UniProtKB/Swiss-Prot annotation:
Membrane topology according to the record: Multi-pass membrane protein
One GO cellular component term: plasma membrane
Official protein name in the record: UPF0104 membrane protein PH1989
UniProt organism field: Pyrococcus horikoshii (strain ATCC 700860 / DSM 12428 / JCM 9974 / NBRC 100139 / OT-3)
Keywords carried by this UniProt record: Cell membrane, Membrane, Transmembrane, Transmembrane helix
Main subcellular location of this protein, as a coarse class: membrane
Transmembrane segments: 4-24, 34-54, 62-82, 122-142, 148-168, 231-251, 266-286, 304-324
Recorded family membership: Belongs to the UPF0104 family.
InterPro entries noted in UniProt: L-PG_synthase/AglD
Domain of life the protein comes from: Archaea
Subcellular location: Cell membrane
């Protein structure tokens, strides 16, 4: 019930934003969009998703997990769908991606697949931190104090998350303590699902943690694979920023690539702390406000944001939902 209430609040924020910018003017602007640049924006989004799948597939191959590339792409969209249903940093889809690929593969285990997902997430954070630093330097030149604070704090938080994830991935003691704590909570909530003793749970968790750690370290030691996946990550985020830039060009807007970079990084930072699933409403309001901060007219700012969200949020969420329904038997099957 709370989730639905938050979604209603988010949709209300979108409607208020459209009313503030002028619904008729905003719709007219979007209807006049140059289809050539819109197609380029869609192409950039498709490239970013394809690169994401290639990067994850590289880690899956490195872990010797046999799964078709089509299933990897499906796994990415299923993850997007479920991430867009969860608030904040949107990590709800990662667990389902693990389940999906484990069941879709011929030889994958949960701990091995989870190691590839964590490695993929770590490689996703590094370019964001780099681009945030570039945006921070640009914000310094234009004396945007609010943006400087947002970007600075966000970059620090991301680095801390990155370090904590890495430590928990290689230190058995910390990982076991955290998982045992969660197991005790779940045992109280679902006692029938956790009938085994704590010693048995600990033994099972330790086995999974060791397999995860072994897989994670093996992936980390392969320098050539790491170099290629790092390159994929920068291409992915570069395509994401170009997508928004092309949407601006489609509406005849005048903006620099650095301004788009600044707004995208700052809006990602704010979306991380959104309590509304998928950042609905919050992302639209924040991104539009940030475009205003760099001198974009309000109707244009809102039009760009709406088209951006249509391409990178609503359509992928719909596709992901369709793929969840298509693969529902696989996802709920026991194995």
């Amino acid at each position: 019930m709370k989730k639905y209430l938050l979604i209603i609040i988010g949709v209300t924020l979108v409607l208020i934003l459209l009313w503030w910018a002028g619904i008729e003017r905003t719709i007219k602007l979007m209807m006049r969009a140059d289809i050539r640049f819109i197609l380029l924006a869609i192409l950039m989004y498709c490239i970013s998703v394809l690169i994401w799948a290639v990067r994850w597939n590289t880690f899956l191959k490195g872990a010797n997990i046999n799964v078709s590339f089509v299933k990897v792409i499906e796994g990415v969209f299923i993850g997007i769908f479920l991430n867009n249903l969860t608030p904040g940093a949107r990590t709800g889809g990662e667990a389902v991606k693990v389940i999906f690929i484990k069941k879709a593969s011929s030889n994958g285990s949960y701990s091995k697949v989870f190691a590839t997902v964590i490695a993929d997430r770590i490689l996703d954070v590094i370019p964001v931190v780099v681009f945030m630093m570039l945006a921070f330097l640009y914000a310094l030149t234009i004396h945007a104090r609010v943006l400087l604070i947002i970007l600075g704090i966000s970059a620090i938080i991301l680095v801390i998350i990155l370090l904590m994830t890495t430590v928990f991935s290689i230190k058995e003691k910390y990982a076991l303590s955290a998982l045992l704590y969660l197991a005790r909570i779940f045992r109280k909530i679902f006692p029938s699902k956790f009938s085994m003793s704590e010693d048995k749970i600990k033994e099972k968790l330790l086995g999974e943690i060791r397999e995860f750690k072994e897989t994670f370290l093996r992936l980390a030691k392969r320098k050539r694979r790491l170099s290629s996946t790092m390159l994929y990550s920068f291409i992915l985020w570069g395509a994401d920023i170009l997508k928004t830039y092309f949407i601006f060009l489609s509406l005849g807007g005048r903006i620099t690539f650095l301004q788009v970079l600044l707004v995208r990084m700052a809006s990602i930072a704010v979306a991380m702390i959104s309590v509304i699933p998928g950042g609905i409403g919050i992302t639209e309001v924040v991104q539009s406000a940030l475009f205003l901060a760099v001198g974009v007219e309000k109707a244009l700012a809102v039009s760009v944001t709406m088209l951006d969200r249509l391409i990178s949020f609503w359509i992928p969420t719909l596709l992901g939902g369709i793929l969840v329904l298509k693969n529902r038997k696989l996802l709920v099957s026991s194995s």
